[in-house]
């Protein structure tokens, strides 16, 4: 139960971007999510936090992001997707701290060759290490939803915009 609570809180605070000009996420049907794992030169994911771990955390049948949205939507919203990465960004974690929106942009750009963003309704970017909201260290990233960002991709000019 604790894992589910942290999963929900953590994933809802992560950077969620909707493709193209979406005004809001759908509340019914199926939403496809590209789930990007990014780490830093000085701060890699723990060895047991691999793609399988995040697949289960995001899309597993219990104590997951999928499970949360299934419950709160009364089985009206199905969240599916793929976990990509981890990708190592250029620079240390502190380079992206203090509310720096470049983390999301750099994560999308480094993953762009592996992801056709036209196949997804939303993008979630997850960082390694603690977030400032829990550590209190301003050099850590504050896990947040960026309200205004636009990122061009290599997918025929496709734009990720929120």
Give a label for each model feature:
Residues 1-5:
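Positively charged n-region of N-terminal signal peptides that target proteins for export
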Residues 6-7, 27:
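Hydrophobic H-region at the start of alpha-helical membrane spans
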Residues 7-17:
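Bacterial N-terminal signal peptides
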Residues 19-24:
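Boundary at the C-terminal end of the N-terminal hydrophobic targeting segment
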Residues 25-162:
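Active-site-proximal segment of zinc-dependent metalloprotease catalytic domains
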């Amino acid at each position: 139960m604790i894992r589910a609570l942290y999963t929900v809180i953590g994933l809802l605070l992560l950077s969620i971007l909707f493709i193209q000009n979406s005004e809001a996420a759908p509340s019914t049907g199926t939403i496809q999510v590209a789930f990007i794992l990014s780490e830093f030169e000085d701060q890699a994911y723990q060895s047991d936090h691999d793609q399988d771990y995040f697949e289960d955390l995001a899309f597993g049948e219990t104590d997951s992001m999928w499970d949360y949205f299934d419950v709160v939507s009364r089985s009206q919203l199905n969240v599916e997707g793929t976990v990509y990465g981890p990708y190592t960004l250029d620079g240390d974690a502190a380079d992206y701290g203090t509310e720096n929106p470049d983390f999301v942009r750099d994560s999308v750009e480094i993953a762009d060759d592996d992801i056709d963003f036209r196949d997804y309704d939303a993008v979630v970017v997850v960082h390694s290490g603690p977030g400032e909201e829990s550590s209190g260290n301003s050099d850590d990233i504050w896990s947040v939803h960026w309200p205004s960002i636009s990122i061009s991709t290599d997918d025929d000019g496709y734009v990720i915009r929120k």
